Amino acid sequence: MLALREPTQESSLKRQAYGQGSCPSIMSDGKARLATTSAQRSTEIMGDLEGRIALVTGGAQGIGRAIAEELAAAGATLALADVNEAKLAETVAELKAQGIDATAFTVNVSSEESIEAGAKAILEKFGKVEILVNNAGITRDNLMLRMKRADWDLVLNINLTGAFLLTQALLSPMLKNRWGRIVSIASVVGRAGQAGQVNYAASKAGLIGLTRSLAREVASRGITVNAVAPGFIETPMTAVLSEEQTKAMLATVPLGRRGTPKDVAQAVKFLASDAASYITGHVLDVNGGMFMGG
């Protein structure tokens, strides 16, 4: 058991020298100022999207919905695009019930005509899109020798070409206003590859290339272009995996768990915020350590 000692004059002087004990009001004021500063910084990061128009594709469920909720929490006005009209309407109704300003746009990103019509409707409604999140994506997995050309084309069309066409359709107002945030959802597979997913990996690697190239084109106009590369995330896409497949996947994750849509959404919100205004052409990995490359 430790014995307590009465404080000596020497220890009192030491505490005074280090600001301990002798000046409680100064310490309290300092802590209060620190707490206030931290709160202000948190508010700046969390709420600096006030009034910004944000479009999230694939926004009806999963990662897309989580992104929409995070951006709304930071003050953004939402435009949600999805091909699933019924699910999209349900999601927007639920968001509105929470007091979130959200508008639904039915868009099929595999169709150039649908993208053009959707972009036109969005611009007519809001005049501009300041934050674009290219989230819509699908998988059609198979081994190379068994993969059908139609499955290759569909995955590339939705995951890559759709993002290209929509970004192209909405870029002009960003250039004119000299401000914009473009964030595309890539994948750890686009960074490291994966057997049985040559189409998906190619589409996501292509999205990373698009991100870095476009970042160089538009940086001088105040527009940042980045990507988030999720790993093993709890989504409808991964829900179909068997218990054995899930265990095998988790064995490759140093953090030992699946990520959540919110993990990805918070990364997107950061890249859309002023806190990330000096970051462009970057791929932010959200994968629990599955991939640690450059």
Language-model segment annotations:
Residues 143-144, 148-156, 238, 249:
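Substrate-binding pocket helix/loop in short-chain dehydrogenase/reductase
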Residues 38, 44-45, 192, 269, ...:
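Short C-terminal tail/terminal secondary-structure segment
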Residues 172, 216-220, 277:
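Alpha-helical segment proximal to the catalytic Tyr-Lys
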Residues 48-78:
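Canonical Rossmann dinucleotide-binding motif of NAD(H)/NADP(H)-dependent dehydrogenases/reductases
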Residues 227, 251-275, 279, 286-288:
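C-terminal helical subdomain
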Residues 187:
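Residue(s) in the substrate-gating loop at a strand-loop-helix junction
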